[in-house]
């Protein structure tokens, strides 16, 4: 029964209609359970654009650590009359009060406040004067809120991950296609200066043919996870008590997917995943006599993904271990290699060398930095300096691009298929990790449209 409950929690309850669970240890049976989550989709939200929205009317649901930061990213857009915040929602009145105070400094009209009940967010979704809903709530609410908002005629921009069950990935895709509403995940690392620089070099042919990439979320979160207030109700810590896999895939995988043009000529084929034993988080919990001190999630998860074109991706996840922050950001090509944290670039010589391989010195490195700076950074670098609180400025660039695409009636940089493909790695990693690193095939959320070669929307100048 425990195993059945685990698989249900990862796939979703309806995955089990007509499927025998008696032999779910067998490879074919597990893959059948995954395949049984599939829903009919069309892929028609690729290159989807809606009518121009001269001023985007925005509602924000969730005004904690993340939501309050995203709110601040709207200052420039509001001053330029590109957007207006008209609804603020959180279950804690102190958070809506704080958000209203921030907003009053640079928006003339005050936003309506919703904080009277756990379901007040539905009132925001049902309003007929809102174009876009920003969702920045605990993970378990991301999918139901996104679905409800789309069903009530709203575009959705949701914090990461947009889903952590396969069935929910299918529901989100199907609902976006049915309602013809944008539904995207707010993956800010795709807008970071380093990642955009690498992407531009790839686009210009500096790396040649990409063969391998590595990304990660290596971030010591022990103090925050164990804090009584930082994650309300310690919702994030509870995930580590009951699950084991890669819970936070998208900071590494989002940029990598753009490097490899996933969904635009290539896609994920299969993965295998394993976790180490857990030691660090429980040790930290015991040191402070925390009531929760037993955790299922291993200290480090390693997930390997193979693409249809034969390229490989290594994703790592570790928020338990004391170490400097890193997303790795490794790109290996036939002509160049990049390693992040700190950023280093190697350019291969025209002829193979026996030895003497070394990273570019600072002078040569800086030449590449200047020559291949991404057009988005060139345009927004100065403005983004005023929004350093948004992860150094990349949060602002992300929100700017979102709103301007809606203003101009353009396809968004990140679409629903990107969002669910990147998020689906989490449940698949859990299934593989808990089944002796079994190789698991990826579902196709695009109905085969991924095979069409298309340019990345993020390479457009707007």
Regions found by a protein language model. Give the residues of each.
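Predominantly a Rossmann-like dinucleotide-binding segment in NAD(P)-dependent oxidoreductases
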Residues: 62, 67, 178-184, 189-295, ...
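Glycine-rich phosphate/pyrophosphate-binding beta-alpha loops
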Residues: 315-325
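Active-site beta-strand termini and strand-to-loop segments that position acidic
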Residues: 303-309, 333
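A short catalytic or substrate-binding loop motif that flags glycine-/basic-rich loops and adjacent residues
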Residues: 250, 294-299, 307-308, 322-323
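ADP-ribose/adenylate-binding Rossmann-like module
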Residues: 153-165
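C-terminal helical cap and adjacent loop that interface with cofactors, partners, or active-site loops
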Residues: 10, 29-30, 36-46, 69, ...
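N-terminal glycine-/serine-/threonine-rich beta1-alpha1-beta2 phosphate-ribose binding loop
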Residues: 2-154, 170-182
